[in-house]
Amino acid sequence: MARILRNVYSLRSSLFSSELLRRSVVGTSFQLRGFAAKAKKKSKSDGNGSSEEGMSKKEIALQQALDQITSSFGKGSIMYLGRAVSPRNVPVFSTGSFALDVALGVGGLPKGRVVEIYGPEASGKTTLALHVIAEAQKQGGTCVFVDAEHALDSSLAKAIGVNTENLLLSQPDCGEQALSLVDTLIRSGSVDVIVVDSVAALVPKGELEGEMGDAHMAMQARLMSQALRKLSHSLSLSQTLLIFINQVRSKLSTFGGFGGPTEVTCGGNALKFYASMRLNIKRIGLIKKGEETTGSQVSVKIVKNKLAPPFRTAQFELEFGKGICKITEIIDLSIKHKFIAKNGTFYNLNGKNYHGKEALKRFLKQNESDQEELMKKLQDKLIADEAADKETESESEEEDSLRVVVSPDNTDDESPALVVGAAAVVVEAA
């Protein structure tokens, strides 16, 4: 009898165990189905528009990974390249020079990027930067000028058009202080343009505290490299345009032999890599009225451009104490595109003759409507020319073309350049 009872008890135990196993398997399968349904439902709600049948396991896994990255690091931390902002549509600030804006390819200097303006002394670097500040202030922007050289001329800034009452000025004691306050301003998200004048004047604190004549090997280069790593991250989260003004030095040793660069910029190589645009500005001539020198002819070469084709050059006039002469730019470009007819010393505009360039400049200064009309014609002409160039390029790609290799000349990072200005388009070579 006891034997029979033991057999009955073991049979009941085995039946109970099998029932538990069946329930756990069924529960697990329902749980897995629920997870899959949630993943598909979530991917639908995110706007993918894919049906459950149309999404493979790989696509579901990718969507789950993207959702996890977005929830962990925020919106925009990962995206499809084709859905991002086009480089040609980035917001910009005008440089104050119509010819230079055209040469840059995007209409000005881009927000949220690093731009380097470098060149020899008295070439117009600070003047160009002040024009950018003036244009940004016209759009209601907040601007900061970090005067590391302690040499900003407020009267020149006013003459250019800068609202000095609303311009923030900092004259830091050392390079670390200057770059630290720049980073703080960028992170605030409330500043539109910051100009640092200049990289050569960003003296490291260790050099200031040392003795005269002490060797400080690559101290400034290390400072710039470390600072730019932080600043590039801060800029990626803001819409601040950061302009570094830089000087050039003679390069004494050239390991590349003859034909290598004879000039080099200050602060090491970090700025060259982090800058989205590098503008090399030079004085190429003087402007005289009789015996008096009233200004200089300036050439700006776009050595680096991440947003448009580089190696173009713009030429314009700088009037001493006034800045860029915009009317001269308009006249020169209008002659080039045949909106103004020139015959000797006479200029014909809308059927009226003007004897000499100065007479035409005076007329345009007094009649802003005619000046704006010429600007509108030039803009429409340049847009039409750009569209025609794109069609020509697409047609020429189908045909064999001759490639010409031109060696650069003996200046820092220079290459063949397209001139945008009064003169026709030319190619500069060694």
From Swiss-Prot:
Keyword annotations: ATP-binding, DNA damage, DNA recombination, DNA-binding, Mitochondrion, Nucleotide-binding, Transit peptide
Source organism (scientific name): Arabidopsis thaliana (Mouse-ear cress)
PANTHER family: DNA REPAIR PROTEIN RECA HOMOLOG 3, MITOCHONDRIAL-RELATED, RECA
Family affiliation: Belongs to the RecA family.
GO biological process: DNA recombination; DNA repair
Protein role: Involved in recombination ability and DNA strand transfer activity.
Signal peptide: none
Residue interval of the organelle targeting sequence: 1-35
Stored NCBIfam families: tigrfam_recA
Spans annotated as Disordered: 385-415
Superkingdom classification of source: Eukaryota
Molecular functions (GO terms): ATP binding; ATP hydrolysis activity; ATP-dependent DNA damage sensor activity; single-stranded DNA binding
CC annotations in GO: mitochondrion
Locations listed in the record: Mitochondrion
Listed Pfam families: RecA, RecA_C
Name by which UniProt lists this protein: DNA repair protein recA homolog 3, mitochondrial
Entries under SUPFAM superfamilies matching the protein: P-loop containing nucleoside triphosphate hydrolases (SSF52540), RecA protein, C-terminal domain (SSF54752)
Record: residues binding ATP: G119, P120, E121, A122, S123, G124, K125, T126
